[in-house]
Design a protein with these regions (language model features):
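C-terminal catalytic domains of large/alpha subunits in multi-subunit enzymes
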Residues: 1-197
Length: 197
């Protein structure tokens, strides 16, 4: 395979362009796709742990995320910098879901938060320390994925709201408020209501 090159006329032996097979001939030799063919697709399951340190200001009903740590099982990381960026970007989205992003509808069904003035997004760097750590755990059997690659795009986003809510409930308990948060986002208004229930 190392001696083969793909060129405009097909595939030829490196250094011997006369020894060539047209791409059409290669495709014809591969057979047809019949819709009945099946293959075993083994899952490449990923997991992550999120830990957040935050503080609640009971006077202003605001949350300040101070530190955030992520340990993510990414299998074999092809490009660790890209994985790190996916985790941090996903984290920002998850913090938005947890603390500010809310779809609000009017009683007549009209979407009330249809622009960036009304629908709050994390728009600047969130002032906190983020510590992502990649854990490369290779699954023993991955079938059609022998390199052990796993997904990374969603775990930054999905786990963040749960981690934030757990930390918020813990912070509220320290303030003498025993609340179970069941609605996101935990906006300052909702946090105020929890603090003064």
């Amino acid at each position: 395979a190392e001696d083969l090159e793909v060129g405009p006329g097909g595939v030829h032996v490196r250094g011997a362009p006369g020894r060539q097979v047209a791409l059409a001939d290669l495709v014809d030799g591969a057979g047809t796709v019949d819709g009945e063919t099946r293959f075993q697709s083994n899952g490449a399951y990923t997991s992550a742990v999120h830990v957040v340190v935050l503080e609640v200001d009971p006077e202003t009903a605001t949350v300040h995320v101070l530190r955030y740590a992520i340990a993510h099982d990414c299998g074999q990381a092809i490009n660790p910098l890209v994985v790190d960026g996916q985790l941090q970007g996903g984290l920002v989205h998850g913090l938005g879901y947890a603390l500010m992003e809310e779809a609000v509808y009017q009683p007549d069904g009209t979407f009330a938060t249809s622009n960036f003035a009304d629908y709050t997004l994390p728009s600047r760097g969130i002032p906190m320390e983020v510590q992502p750590r990649l854990v490369e755990v290779h699954a023993p059997v991955l079938g059609n994925n022998p390199q052990g690659f796993k997904g990374v795009g969603e775990t930054g986003t999905i786990a963040a709201p749960a981690a934030v809510v757990g930390a918020l409930e813990n912070a509220l308990r320290r303030l003498g408020v025993h609340a179970e948060i069941g609605t996101l986002p935990v906006t300052p208004r909702r946090l105020y209501e929890l603090l003064h229930a």
